[in-house]
Amino acid sequence: MTENSDKVPITMVGPEDVEFCSPPAYTTVTVKPSGSPTRLLKVGAVVLISGAVLLLFGAIGAFYFWKGNDNHIYNVHYSMSINGKLQDGSMEIDAVNNLETFKMGSGAEEAIEVNDFKNGITGIRFAGGEKCYIKAQVKARIPEVGTVTKQSISELEGKIMPANYEENSLIWVAVDQPVKDSSFLSSKILELCGDLPIFWLKPMYPKEIQRERREVVRNSAPSTTRRPHSEPRGNAGPGRLSNGTRPNVQDDAEPFNPDNPYHQQEGESMTFDPRLDHEGICCIECRRSYTHCQKICEPLGGYYPWPYNYQGCRSACRVVMPCSWWVARILGMV
């Protein structure tokens, strides 16, 4: 059997055919890695510099923001003697948001009171308590003051102030049911209360105060039926309980009464809303601060007259400043 393929003898392979028999030649090529260390270092340096610049601008912005807000926020720390026990207290006034915050005690005995003058709400919370309390507050209508005497209260810093209680002082008792819709409350009050149920507080007058109020109404009733010849600009109406450390002051039908010492103008003709004084926000005639304590109690559901309708009272104390200083702080003039 003959083979169709032709065989080439080895001896007939010439030099020109050697290149077809030798293995292919490889050229040495230097290949640079895709991620060069120099390039990575440059990228890292750019990232670090950019981050440092951002941090620098952030720090500068935060500094100026803090510096701007610091001009409108005032803090003072003091001590208060309550029933012979010394407790720390602090007061913070936020002029921008019309907020006033008082803290008394520490730990399980801490009480926090936030006065939201913009919305007319006061929030009170006790440490370890299961409820948060709110009550109606006067909306601060800051009057226009031409010249204000700048009163320094540096003496209040670190001072020990006695907290005096009156037997017949006003008592605040929580209602039976919590607030269902809290959308009307400000973010500061909601932050204070957190997840606790919120209860309205209603004023409760002891028997002695109720008797005095009835006598005031009875005595003032004849004066409303006849008009005297020389009548002052403001007629006295039913009495309203004043601040805890001062005697009762009758409420006024008109905003100013020259016969009422709490409405007398001070040295530089500075006038204030009388409700600021009546609600215990500040003291019109005072030249120095004083303490004001209020009792927050739980309803008992018993007979209405005192003391059968409340229980479990706790105290929340604060410092009442002179109205001239208080208004000046809110206006940012001190």
UniProtKB/Swiss-Prot annotation:
Location of region: Disordered: 212-270
Top-level taxon of origin: Eukaryota
Gene3D superfamilies per the UniProt record, alphabetical: 3.30.390.150
Modification after translation, per record: After cleavage, the post-translationally modified ChM-I is secreted as a glycoprotein.
UniProt key word Nucleus: no
Protein name: Leukocyte cell-derived chemotaxin 1
One of the Pfam families matching this protein, by short name: BRICHOS
PANTHER family: CHONDROMODULIN-RELATED, LEUKOCYTE CELL-DERIVED CHEMOTAXIN 1
Disulfide bonds: C132-C193, C282-C286, C283-C323, C293-C317, C297-C313
Signal peptide as annotated in the record: none
Domain BRICHOS positions: 105-201
Stated family: Belongs to the chondromodulin-1 family.
Gene name of this polypeptide: Cnmd
Keywords of this entry: Chondrogenesis, Cleavage on pair of basic residues, Developmental protein, Differentiation, Disulfide bond, Extracellular matrix, Glycoprotein, Membrane, Secreted, Transmembrane, Transmembrane helix
Residues that make up the propeptide removed upon maturation: 211-214
Effect of deleting the gene: Aged mice show enhanced VEGFA expression, angiogenesis, inflammatory cell infiltration, aortic stenosis, lipid deposition and calcification in the cardiac valves.
List of glycosylated residues: N243
Cited function: Bifunctional growth regulator that stimulates the growth of cultured chondrocytes in the presence of basic fibroblast growth factor (FGF) but inhibits the growth of cultured vascular endothelial cells. May contribute to the rapid growth of cartilage and vascular invasion prior to the replacement of cartilage by bone during endochondral bone development. Inhibits in vitro tube formation and mobilization of endothelial cells. Plays a role as antiangiogenic factor in cardiac valves to suppress neovascularization.
UniProt note on tissues of expression: Detected in the four cardiac valves, valvular interstitial cells and extracellular matrix (at protein level).
Organism listed in the record: Mus musculus (Mouse)
